[in-house]
Amino acid sequence: YMGSGTSLVEASIKGINAIGTDLNPLARLMSHVKTTHYDLSCIRDTFSMMQALFFEYSEDKVKNKNFDNISNYTYWYSRDSLLRLSYIYQVINECVALDFADFFKVPLSETVREVSFTRNGEFKRFRMKEEKIKDFKPDVFRLFEEKVIRNINGLEEFNSIKYPCNIGIYDFNSTIEIPSDIIQPNSVDMVVTSPPYGDSRTTVAYGQFSRWANEWFNFENAKTLDNLLMGGRVQKEELFETKSI
């Protein structure tokens, strides 16, 4: 469970070979972007082009107005936010070079949650009270742009520290099997994992927190992710034997 890939970034800036795995496609996207040395000049030029297109926005320029892939979208979003989010995604898909698209999907993944009617500071989905919703009018483009600028600053710092190393990002379930073709036995010097916490489905709601972006990007298992993560399903028999420390 590599989460947002912070451990992989730290390994990268120290020149340490590292492998991360996560069943959550959003976690893999974020980890990939955070450990990639993008061309800073190209990213900045692309962002300037996107900002110009945002300035030209109008509702009739939004091509995809079908939001059926988003659970209860009228409950969680205003129509204006839905259209502007769709326009940003459209610009990324149609106008951004494929090599740089993921870089801009990461700030969009944050924006889709922040402009929704979900309460701030919650991992689980809890809707704002009606009186707050009436006054909630997020500036979708500005929020997205602020996150892009923050990430560009982070990229500039990351690019200033380059050491030769290999970073691998995978989706295998380490509680079931660690593929020997990816990680050979006795080849790992250190394992970094999260501290113990409750199961994902009822306690941490890791999948619920990620579901906003996973649905927007049409990632596989977006609606059932918590069932696939730790504690999502009860196992009636041991999957493998472990040795005591």
Give the location of each predicted region.
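SAM-dependent nucleic-acid methyltransferase catalytic core
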Residues: 82-193, 198-205
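SAM-dependent methyltransferase catalytic-core segment centered on the flexible catalytic loop
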Residues: 197-245
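Glycine-rich, phosphate-binding/catalytic loops in enzymes
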Residues: 36-37, 186, 207-212
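Noncatalytic linker/hinge segments flanking ATPase motor cores
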Residues: 42, 58-68, 132-133, 230-240
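Non-catalytic nucleic-acid substrate-recognition regions in nucleic-acid-modifying enzymes
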Residues: 13-14, 19-21, 25-98, 102-110
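Conserved proline-anchored active-site loop of SAM-dependent methyltransferases
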Residues: 1-14, 18-25, 31, 104, ...
